[in-house]
């Protein structure tokens, strides 16, 4: 599984509209990837129906929940510091309960509850519907835990509230879990095996968002392009499905087509893709429909075949390059972004140079780059020595970052003189006189407000750029308005 960590969103307290009949207060923070933020919306919806309104004031909360990430050691250390803060407040307000959700819950359940005694409940990603029962256990003075992984839970029957929402963009989860056993990743062990959500429940959720005025959705999954609905159950069991189930199964390109046709004025994104599942049929659907954004996040992790094999990635360097060529041929204006790990165990300078040369070949629009962080419970953590020094990791990572910066500038400059369609999402951070949004390629665009408003689709002529931002002037509304 690939996880995009948006640093600007980490740790925000999440708020939804209060119900007057609710008397208890929930403080919930989320860390990690978009799936964690989507899960927090599900949790808030469940607890809203069980007497809880949300608050962004920690000290007044009856219940504090933190949705956790285990992808890197830095993320876990951040969450541990937050737990220390919660417990400091709890010493002043002993009635306050503290719970851990998400990926750290399964991995560190015993440590949190029994050894360190810093939380009252621990709830895994597939057990959120059990929260009301677990809270009853806590109220009766018992620690509560449920980290059982499910074969079929997709939360398709839960209508998520939209936390920290701008009312314009929303996440729609379509798969859960992961069947790819990448040696560096904890996700298959913390989120379970892959299963997909029923298509009609997805369409119903998008319909609800459309009626509420949302303009853009992101179809979300650990491996979104391997979506496969055949009546329920794990994807790995599809081979045992009946002939009728196989004949009526819906895969990702079919779902993408359904959404694009069903909501022609809704902008559609998806994340995250795995190279081995990004089939030509998906690319043709993307090219066919103008409301499907022309951006593909396509993690590669390394440009070295030897390291890819050590990582148990299900593609080679050559297969990845062929896929890049297909994307360029079928969707010439597509942007492509990457995940890259520097300093994986046994990585040599030659392996690193293979990564550099792959980046030179693709010239990504942007990327998410990290030095290797050994994660307990992964195959790499158990079987491989973390033998690349921190100094070498840092140097290689910086070389990757510097090259990506160069390519991002080059790609951004290509937009100068073009007119691009932008969905206005918010006021610019740098100037209250400017709006900020993204174009189809997921590049941030900033332009003067004039008479436009948040939620408008605006055509913007690009005048200048930085490596990560396009700057221009509005020339009118787009056809999507």
UniProtKB/Swiss-Prot annotation:
<keyword id="KW-0963">Cytoplasm</keyword>
<feature type="binding site">
    <location>
        <position position="182"/>
    </location>
    <ligand>
        <name>[4Fe-4S] cluster 2</name>
    </ligand>
</feature>
<dbReference type="InterPro" id="IPR023404">
    <property type="entry name" value="rSAM_horseshoe"/>
</dbReference>
<dbReference type="InterPro" id="IPR006638">
    <property type="entry name" value="Elp3/MiaA/NifB-like_rSAM"/>
</dbReference>
<dbReference type="GO" id="GO:0005829">
    <property type="term" value="C:cytosol"/>
</dbReference>
<dbReference type="Pfam" id="PF00919">
    <property type="entry name" value="UPF0004"/>
</dbReference>
<dbReference type="GO" id="GO:0035597">
    <property type="term" value="F:N6-isopentenyladenosine methylthiotransferase activity"/>
</dbReference>
<dbReference type="Pfam" id="PF04055">
    <property type="entry name" value="Radical_SAM"/>
</dbReference>
<dbReference type="InterPro" id="IPR013848">
    <property type="entry name" value="Methylthiotransferase_N"/>
</dbReference>
<dbReference type="InterPro" id="IPR020612">
    <property type="entry name" value="Methylthiotransferase_CS"/>
</dbReference>
<keyword id="KW-0808">Transferase</keyword>
<dbReference type="Pfam" id="PF01938">
    <property type="entry name" value="TRAM"/>
</dbReference>
<dbReference type="InterPro" id="IPR006463">
    <property type="entry name" value="MiaB_methiolase"/>
</dbReference>
<dbReference type="InterPro" id="IPR005839">
    <property type="entry name" value="Methylthiotransferase"/>
</dbReference>
<keyword id="KW-0819">tRNA processing</keyword>
<keyword id="KW-0004">4Fe-4S</keyword>
<dbReference type="GO" id="GO:0051539">
    <property type="term" value="F:4 iron, 4 sulfur cluster binding"/>
</dbReference>
<keyword id="KW-0949">S-adenosyl-L-methionine</keyword>
<dbReference type="InterPro" id="IPR007197">
    <property type="entry name" value="rSAM"/>
</dbReference>
<comment type="similarity">
    <text>Belongs to the methylthiotransferase family. MiaB subfamily.</text>
</comment>
<keyword id="KW-0479">Metal-binding</keyword>
<dbReference type="GO" id="GO:0046872">
    <property type="term" value="F:metal ion binding"/>
</dbReference>
<protein>
    <recommendedName>
        <fullName>tRNA-2-methylthio-N(6)-dimethylallyladenosine synthase</fullName>
        <ecNumber>2.8.4.3</ecNumber>
    </recommendedName>
</protein>
<feature type="binding site">
    <location>
        <position position="103"/>
    </location>
    <ligand>
        <name>[4Fe-4S] cluster 1</name>
    </ligand>
</feature>
<feature type="domain" description="TRAM">
    <location>
        <begin position="413"/>
        <end position="476"/>
    </location>
</feature>
<feature type="binding site">
    <location>
        <position position="33"/>
    </location>
    <ligand>
        <name>[4Fe-4S] cluster 1</name>
    </ligand>
</feature>
<dbReference type="InterPro" id="IPR038135">
    <property type="entry name" value="Methylthiotransferase_N_sf"/>
</dbReference>
<feature type="binding site">
    <location>
        <position position="69"/>
    </location>
    <ligand>
        <name>[4Fe-4S] cluster 1</name>
    </ligand>
</feature>
<keyword id="KW-0411">Iron-sulfur</keyword>
<comment type="function">
    <text>Catalyzes the methylthiolation of N6-(dimethylallyl)adenosine (i(6)A), leading to the formation of 2-methylthio-N6-(dimethylallyl)adenosine (ms(2)i(6)A) at position 37 in tRNAs that read codons beginning with uridine.</text>
</comment>
<feature type="domain" description="MTTase N-terminal">
    <location>
        <begin position="24"/>
        <end position="140"/>
    </location>
</feature>
<dbReference type="InterPro" id="IPR002792">
    <property type="entry name" value="TRAM_dom"/>
</dbReference>
<feature type="binding site">
    <location>
        <position position="178"/>
    </location>
    <ligand>
        <name>[4Fe-4S] cluster 2</name>
    </ligand>
</feature>
<keyword id="KW-0408">Iron</keyword>
<comment type="subunit">
    <text>Monomer.</text>
</comment>
<feature type="domain" description="Radical SAM core">
    <location>
        <begin position="164"/>
        <end position="411"/>
    </location>
</feature>
<feature type="binding site">
    <location>
        <position position="185"/>
    </location>
    <ligand>
        <name>[4Fe-4S] cluster 2</name>
    </ligand>
</feature>
């Amino acid at each position: 599984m690939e996880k995009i960590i948006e640093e600007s969103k980490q740790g925000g307290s999440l708020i939804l509209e209060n119900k007057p009949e609710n008397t208890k207060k929930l403080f919930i923070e989320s860390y990690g990837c978009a799936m964690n933020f989507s899960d927090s919306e599900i949790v808030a919806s469940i607890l809203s129906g069980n007497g809880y309104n949300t608050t962004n004031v920690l000290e007044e909360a009856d219940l504090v929940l933190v949705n956790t990430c285990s992808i890197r050691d830095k993320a876990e250390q951040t969450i541990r510091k937050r737990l220390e803060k919660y417990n400091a407040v709890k010493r002043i307000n002993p009635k306050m309960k503290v719970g851990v959700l998400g990926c750290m819950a399964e991995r560190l359940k015993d440590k949190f509850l029994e050894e360190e005694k810093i939380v009252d409940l621990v709830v895994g990603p597939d057990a959120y519907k059990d929260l009301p029962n677990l809270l009853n256990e806590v109220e009766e003075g018992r620690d509560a835990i449920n980290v059982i992984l499910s074969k079929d839970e997709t939360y398709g029957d839960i209508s998520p509230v939209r936390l920290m929402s701008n009312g314009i963009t929303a996440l729609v989860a379509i798969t859960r879990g992961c069947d790819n056993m990448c040696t560096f990743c904890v996700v298959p062990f913390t989120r379970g095996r892959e299963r997909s959500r029923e298509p009609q429940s997805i369409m119903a959720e998008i319909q609800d968002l459309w009626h509420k005025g949302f303009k853009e959705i992101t179809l979300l999954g650990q491996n979104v392009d391997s979506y496969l609905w055949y009546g329920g159950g794990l994807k790995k069991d599809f081979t045992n499905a009946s002939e009728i189930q196989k004949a009526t199964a819906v895969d990702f390109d079919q779902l993408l087509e359904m959404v694009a046709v069903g909501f022609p004025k809704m902008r559609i994104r998806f994340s995250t893709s795995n190279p081995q599942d990004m089939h030509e049929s998906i690319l043709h659907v993307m090219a066919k429909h103008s409301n499907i954004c022309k951006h593909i996040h396509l993690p590669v992790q390394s440009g070295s075949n030897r390291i890819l094999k050590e990582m148990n990635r299900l593609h080679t360097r050559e297969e990845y390059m062929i896929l890049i060529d297909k994307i360029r041929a079928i969707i010439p204006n597509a942007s492509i972004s990457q995940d890259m790990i520097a300093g994986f165990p046994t990585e040599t300078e030659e392996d690193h140079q293979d990564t550099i040369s792959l980046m030179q070949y693709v010239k990504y629009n942007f990327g998410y780059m990290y030095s290797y962080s050994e994660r307990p419970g992964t195959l790499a953590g158990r079987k491989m020595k973390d033998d690349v020094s921190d100094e070498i990791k840092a140097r290689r990572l910086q070389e990757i970052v510097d090259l990506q910066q160069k390519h991002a500038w080059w790609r951004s400059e290509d937009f100068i003189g073009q007119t691009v369609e932008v969905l206005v999402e918010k006021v610019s951070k740098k100037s209250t006189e400017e709006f900020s949004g993204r174009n189809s390629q997921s590049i941030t665009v900033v332009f003067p407000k004039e008479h436009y408003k948040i939620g408008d689709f605006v055509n913007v002529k690009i005048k200048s750029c930085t490596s990560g931002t396009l700057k221009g002037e509005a020339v009118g509304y787009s056809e999507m308005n």
